[in-house]
């Protein structure tokens, strides 16, 4: 198919138009008094949200060059959400400001590659400055304040999340579930989590959340590669007779065996999910043995002498519930013998004391935390499905922000830490166009604070000017409209979220600034037309393919 091209200033201007379209839709949600966006759904009621990444996912522009710019900024939100689960609106606002200032400099004659290097060096200095400012969580009150702020100042959500995170600690796991009852509740249950998800999206039970959730499943644990139908059929028959879902934790499942399991899910004849077994190399069998003790099953391996063809229900583990996402698996309520589990934990602790290599020590610490970790389940209810979805998004954002704060500490919030971090750039010795790149970052750092103030009904430029002259850590509280110490006022942000937002924004902005050519598929003015001389379009009135844009 023919391509359409744009070059130099024209290409960058069209890309910037898309950047602005997406960012303008997202930035009105920033801050404690940010507004909502209403998103149309092809099926069901519309979604009302102030979650940046949720809004960004829905945006697709008609003009293809502008759409490329919008998709690049969408990547900023997606990347930030993937790393820390929050800060997507801040990242989008920063990206828009950096793109605007950077393109203005390039159009004025600056060398884009040198501008890019200046941006990268400036961001590195700002991140180091933020790290120095960061302080550790002071207690449950700090947890509650972070969660409350991330949930658009909802104290009910803040209290529930702080209670859950404080209970499970750093090694525990907190998950969210929809509830039929109004309000929020927190349930504490024993659970195990590891960082491997399903190997096929066709196995999800909740397409909207892209999760596979099974209650009381049978769990096959093996370090073998399963490719043939005869390898997996005995386990399927056991699960079918018991009328229970089948979860397969294996080194690899592929070929006809995987096709059989996927087909069973698609035709709803057999519920199953396949997850790559945790661990690598020689550690995989050891981690599978940990799970076998917790779940009450056996590891099917060459060393144990049990073959896949010999499997019975006694060889399979089980649990109360298992939740599998694209990247994580959470097991709740393992049906293993508690005495054997305690003995296994004691054995691992003994191995940890004797371990001399740092990698072995870290691996054993992870395995111990996995077996002793607790899971807190936050159940979210709403009066309508629209309210439920909106509240779920806020709970998930607040939870991600709180866990990030526990992990890496906190900085002054409300855009203050970023707005005041320009002071660290004063000692950065850059010349020429690299100095211009540094100025791009310096001007962009105040943009989140400006929009937090604007959304709260204040003059953004005036607020930025005042905060720039305040002592470090003192800023603008958009909720009260007053200036003061952000930590004393409880206006704080996780350092990890702030860092991820800045780095993601700078990455995409640097790429856009150095763009000279944009290439898209040629847009058909009348797709599906059959033009005949003297007759016009012979396909007029017929169903025709829609334009890809």
Curated annotation (Swiss-Prot):
GO function terms (MF aspect): ATP binding; ATP-dependent protein folding chaperone
Protein's name according to its UniProt entry: Probable chaperonin-like protein PrmG
Gene Ontology biological-process annotations: protein refolding
InterPro entries, A to Z: Cpn60/GroEL, Cpn60/GroEL/TCP-1, GroEL-like_apical_dom_sf, GROEL-like_equatorial_sf, TCP-1-like_intermed_sf
Protein function: Probably plays an essential role in the productive folding of PrmA, and thus in the formation of the active PrmABCD complex.
Family statement drawn from the similarity comment of this UniProt entry: Belongs to the chaperonin (HSP60) family.
Keyword ATP-binding: no
Pfam families (alphabetical): Cpn60_TCP1
Protein's organism: Rhodococcus jostii (strain RHA1)
Keyword Chaperone: yes
């Amino acid at each position: 198919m023919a391509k359409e091209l744009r070059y130099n200033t024209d290409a960058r201007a069209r890309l910037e138009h898309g950047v602005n379209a997406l960012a303008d839709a997202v930035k009105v949600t920033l801050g404690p008094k940010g507004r909502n966006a209403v998103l149309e759904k092809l099926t069901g009621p519309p979604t009302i949200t102030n979650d940046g990444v949720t809004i960004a996912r829905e945006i697709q522009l008609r003009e293809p060059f502008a759409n490329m710019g919008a998709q690049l900024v969408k990547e900023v939100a997606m990347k930030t959400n993937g790393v820390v689960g929050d800060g997507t609106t801040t990242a989008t606002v920063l990206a828009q400001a950096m793109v605007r200032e950077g393109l203005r400099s390039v159009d004025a004659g600056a060398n884009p590659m040198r501008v890019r290097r200046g941006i990268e060096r400036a961001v590195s200095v700002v991140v180091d400055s933020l790290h120095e400012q960061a302080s550790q969580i002071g207690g449950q009150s700090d947890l509650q304040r972070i969660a409350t702020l991330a949930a658009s100042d909802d104290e009910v959500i803040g209290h529930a999340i702080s209670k859950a995170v404080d209970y499970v600690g750093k090694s525990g796991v907190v998950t969210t579930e929809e509830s039929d009852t109004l309000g929020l509740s927190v349930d504490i249950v024993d659970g195990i989590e590891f960082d491997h998800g399903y190997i096929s999206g066709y196995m999800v039970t909740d397409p909207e959340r892209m999760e596979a959730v099974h209650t009381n499943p049978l769990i096959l644990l093996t370090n073998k590669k399963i490719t043939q139908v005869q390898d997996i059929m005995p386990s399927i028959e056991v699960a079918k007779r018991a009328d229970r879902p089948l979860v397969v934790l294996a080194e690899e499942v592929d070929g006809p065996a995987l096709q059989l399991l996927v087909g069973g899910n698609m035709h709803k004849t057999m519920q199953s999910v396949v997850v790559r077994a945790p661990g690598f190399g020689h550690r995989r069998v050891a981690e599978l043995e940990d799970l076998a003790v917790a779940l009450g099953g056996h590891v099917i391996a060459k060393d144990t002498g049990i073959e896949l063809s010999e499997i019975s229900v006694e060889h399979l583990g089980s649990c109360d519930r298992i939740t599998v996402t694209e990247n994580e698996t959470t097991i709740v309520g393992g049906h293993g013998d508690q005495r054997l589990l305690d003995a296994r934990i004691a054995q691992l602790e003994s191995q940890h004391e004797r371990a001399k290599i740092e990698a072995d020590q870290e691996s054993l610490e992870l395995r111990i935390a996995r077996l002793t970790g607790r899971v807190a389940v936050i159940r979210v209810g709403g009066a309508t499905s629209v309210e439920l979805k909106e509240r779920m998004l806020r709970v998930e954002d607040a939870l991600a922000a709180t866990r990030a704060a526990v992990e890496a500490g906190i900085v002054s919030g409300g855009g203050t830490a970023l707005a005041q971090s320009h002071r660290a750039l004063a000692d950065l010795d850059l010349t020429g166009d690299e100095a211009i790149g540094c100025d791009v970052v310096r001007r962009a750092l105040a943009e989140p604070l400006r929009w937090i103030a604007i959304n709260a009904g204040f003059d953004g430029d005036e607020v930025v000017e005042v905060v720039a002259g305040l002592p470090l850590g003192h800023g603008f509280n958009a909720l009260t409209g007053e200036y003061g110490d952000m930590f004393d006022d409880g206006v704080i942000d996780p350092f990890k979220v702030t860092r991820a937002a800045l780095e993601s924004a700078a990455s995409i902005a640097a790429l856009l600034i150095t763009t000279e050519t944009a290439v898209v598929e040629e847009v058909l003015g009348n797709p599906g037309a059959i033009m005949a001389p003297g007759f016009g379009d012979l396909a007029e009135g017929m169903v025709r393919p829609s334009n890809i844009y």
